[in-house]
């Protein structure tokens, strides 16, 4: 009896997805700045993500992800990708207590996007979950 081959059939080659060029002149930039990372997503008015970047995605690891400089590079990266899709003006929604909030907004402006309104949408608990205990250093 011949040995069974472990082949599961023909190899499936992964096809590169073609990214459609959207033409969206006005969008929204959502900046989520936590104590560990900063995530910048640029969406169309319906909320569909056009481009995104984060401090970790840009190349920072560990505690360097939470720095303002990492947030600046992430925002510039997301803005550059969004401008390829025709985004010129954004409304900014900032969420979270992190250190990269203001830096990310400034770098969106420096990258060439016109910033309309800036809104803080940080969720506030109405006495919900118990917060983490205080650090003892």
UniProtKB/Swiss-Prot annotation:
Coiled coil: none annotated. One of its GO terms (molecular function) is structural constituent of ribosome. The keyword rRNA-binding applies. Residues 1-28, 117-137 are annotated as: Disordered. The keyword tRNA-binding does not apply. GO terms for biological process: translation. It holds the Pfam family Ribosomal_S11. Disulfide bonds: none annotated. Residues 1-11 have a biased composition (Polar residues). GO terms for cellular component: ribonucleoprotein complex; ribosome. Keywords: Ribonucleoprotein, Ribosomal protein, RNA-binding, rRNA-binding. InterPro entries: Ribosomal_uS11, Ribosomal_uS11_bac-type, Ribosomal_uS11_CS, Ribosomal_uS11_sf. Residues 12-21 have a biased composition (Basic residues). PANTHER family: 40S RIBOSOMAL PROTEIN S14/30S RIBOSOMAL PROTEIN S11. Located on the platform of the 30S subunit, it bridges several disparate RNA helices of the 16S rRNA. Forms part of the Shine-Dalgarno cleft in the 70S ribosome. HAMAP family: Ribosomal_uS11. Part of the 30S ribosomal subunit. Interacts with proteins S7 and S18. Binds to IF-3. This is Small ribosomal subunit protein uS11. The lineage of its organism: Bacteria, Bacillati, Actinomycetota, Actinomycetes, Mycobacteriales.
């Amino acid at each position: 009896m011949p040995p069974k081959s472990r082949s599961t059939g023909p190899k499936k080659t992964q096809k590169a997805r073609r990214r459609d060029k959207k033409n969206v002149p006005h969008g929204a930039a959502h900046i989520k700045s936590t104590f560990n990372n900063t995530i910048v997503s640029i969406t169309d008015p319906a909320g569909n993500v056009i481009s995104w970047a984060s401090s970790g995605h840009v190349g920072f690891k560990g505690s360097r992800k939470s720095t303002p400089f990492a947030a600046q590079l992430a925002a510039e990266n997301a803005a550059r990708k969004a401008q390829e899709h025709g985004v010129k003006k954004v409304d900014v929604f900032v969420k979270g207590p992190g250190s990269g909030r203001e830096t990310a907004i400034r770098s969106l402006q420096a990258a060439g996007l016109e910033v309309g309104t800036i809104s803080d949408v940080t969720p506030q608990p109405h006495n919900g979950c118990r917060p983490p205990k205080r650090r003892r250093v």
